[in-house]
Amino acid sequence: MKYLFKKIEPKWQAKWEEAKVFEAKDNSDKPKFYGLVEFPYPSGAGMHVGHIKAYSSLEVISRKRRMEGYNVLFPIGFDAFGLPTENYAVKTGTHPRIITDENIKRFSNQLKKVGFSFDWNRVIDTTDEDYYKWTQWIFLKMFEKGLVFRDRTLVNYCPHCKVVLSNEDSQGGKCDICHSDVVQKSKDVWYLRITQYADKLLEGLKDVDYPDNVKQQQIHWIGKSKGAFVNFDVDGIDEKLEIYTTRPDTLFGVTFMVIAPEHPIIDKYADKITNMDEITAYRNECAKKTEFERTQLVKDKTGVRIQGLEGINPVNGKKIPIYIADYVMMGYGTGAIMAVPAHDQRDYDFAKKFGIDIIEVIKGGDISKEAYTGDGEMVNSDFLNGYAKKKDSIERMLEELEKKGIGKAGVQYKMKDWAFNRQRYWGEPIPLIHCPNCGVVAVPEEELPLRLPDVKDFEPGEDGQSPLAKIDSFVNCTCPKCGAAAKRETDTMPQWAGSSWYFLRYTDPHNANALADMDKLKYWMPVDWYNGGMEHVTRHMIYSRFWHHFLYDLGVVNTPEPYAKRSIQGLILGPDGDKMSKSKGNVVDPLDIVEEYGADTLRTYVLFMGDYGAATPWSENSVKGCKKFLDRVAGLTDILSEESVSDELEMKLHRTIKKVSSDIENLKFNTAIASLMTLINEITAEGHLSKDDLTIFIKLLSPFAPHICEEIWEFIGGEGLLAVSEWPKYDEGKTIAKTVEIGVQVNGKVRGTIVIPNGCEKEKAFEIAKADERIASFLEGKNLIKEIYVPNKIVNFVAK
């Protein structure tokens, strides 16, 4: 047989679809397996090889699970709201709906050409009204429970996309969407109180099977710290500045304070500040900087002392200067910090620049050269002097703070509440109404979905308002509470909204009355295995875990955690070893590979190219190597025989079953495929194999290269579809060689080798060794003093 991929691949894709072999059943008696991949954003560029790698791991696992007798849910959908589509719509004048539908159709066809075993009956699209009705419903439940609030604050704003970005979407001072520079802008922002779930998100990590680096990234992102809130009086006025510190034991070393340029105390007491012009000029400069620019550790320290306001150190009563500096943000902590320059390098650099006192309170370093950040004995600290353990000194200081009413133990999180609105058209409308009498009111549930109006102008306003603000028929409404004339919220949700619960909808995608039926949720949830990219383990995974915990508290879902297990794929790099990008001209189109070499070749190569979790460069020669391997697989039909294979080959066959089965579960796809390549060499060397042995081989290969394996299965008369046949089982006894080759030593020197039965008794081993002509020649004419046998390893004769 020949590997005629252009003929057989569409043939088997049609047969799978006709037989509905990949459709999950909601009422099966089989054990369930829910495998999930991160659903794609359907861009105009279509699918790239990164998608193939991302989906291939659970494609292989899901195909194996079906053959193991599981009822498998392996769904796909499209995360289709978002700015790239809207920006393209603005550029071309084409409605985002049309663009999205075309892109989804193209993407679906591409995925089908590769032969992925997705359940196409459960496809979801986050832009579908029947889907985003439930996204809006979840949002309203959060609003109802007080998890939604609005605040006017400085936000990260992308002038190019004309949209507010969360901290997560503007890392490095760049827009995550268009990569242009982000600026700070004062705006009204809707937030979700994700910080209320910080502890649950941390605790939940104990109950899931995530790689350690994924857990650590989430722990770091949430950034829980234990410390103290401490009040500093401001001299001469009835005002306190609250700070948060993880090192309250260093309070005696506080020699100045720094507050954010936006801190309200500045405007409140402007008449007492004698250098207000200087302060105002500095604040104006800060307003031009992004948060990233302001908080960089490696930069020149800038700041201005507030003349006319001084703080008072609460533990020693000393007056200390107050500065404003750009590195302190109102959105972090309390907007004010205490500075201990002897033991914090940034404070040290600031103090050196502005000539501020530096007081050592922890022995161990040379503060004339740099800050000492290690542990040591407390000094210059009154009642803490002599304490050597940080834990003890912190506890003692907390006692003092609480006794005097000037501070208390507290917890802070690096993670901030989630900025949840965008000033663009192509997103879920936020279902809230602004009433002059009732304030902010929820759209009644029976009126959901609140549909996006059909518009021709998608351009956001220069004033930072959403395109929806220009549509009077959408904006103007009546208050559902009092009937007064009111206005709808015109911002839309971020793209992260739809992806925060999509895995639930797959369990019941056509339900008009609930986001999913509870019985179906109880059957399918949690997701057994979720694979995706490292770039999504913080934002998307934390957001979706937050939503899921909330729905669990609400009684809508049956498990606190959505994903039982998580795995990560590495990048596919260009042939030059660089990250693939159009600008570098090193992008590989997967459909070009399908056209030239076949889908099975593409599937096999993507998993053979290297460690699944590592970044690996593309190699056209290795693609050709995988094609040759599949050509050889097809050729196995030409050496079918009634004759049994040798014991040696039977052993290698059972070892391969064991290895491939294990390697798949451990994501060692490259070594699984390599073992099949080795086995085909052994089979070819033997010159023949039986139908039963060929069946085992193609079953092991089928999750990787299902089309050619189905074709061979049909050729040899297999019943039904190979995709749902039984996964091979190995016989442990047959994985053990019947004979072993061992070395024979005479007086400590290896003189030859012998073949003995596996597990051979020592007397038999000695007998075989002595019967060997070469060994016998070294023993001839000598007296045996000692005979030594290490089972299955070596025979040693000591002779004189």
Predicted segments, located by residue:
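Secondary-structure transition/capping motifs at alpha-helix termini
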Residues: 63-71, 91-97, 109, 113-117, ...
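Conserved oxyanion/phosphate-binding beta-strand-loop segments in alpha/beta enzyme cores
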Residues: 1-36, 66-75, 99-106, 282-323, ...
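Glycine- and acidic
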Residues: 38-47, 119-124, 329-337, 379-383, ...
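Alpha-helical recognition segments enriched in aromatics with Gly/Pro capping
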Residues: 309-332, 361, 475-614
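N-terminal catalytic cores of NTP/NDP-binding nucleotidyl/phosphoryl-transfer enzymes
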Residues: 25-96, 123-138, 245-246, 313-350, ...
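Residue patterns forming the tRNA-binding/recognition surfaces of aminoacyl-tRNA synthetases
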Residues: 2, 11, 15-19, 91-241, ...
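NTP-handling and nucleic-acid-processing catalytic cores
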Residues: 3, 8-13, 49, 134-358, ...
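Helix-rich, typically C-terminal accessory recognition domains appended to large enzymatic cores
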Residues: 79, 144-160, 250, 409-438, ...
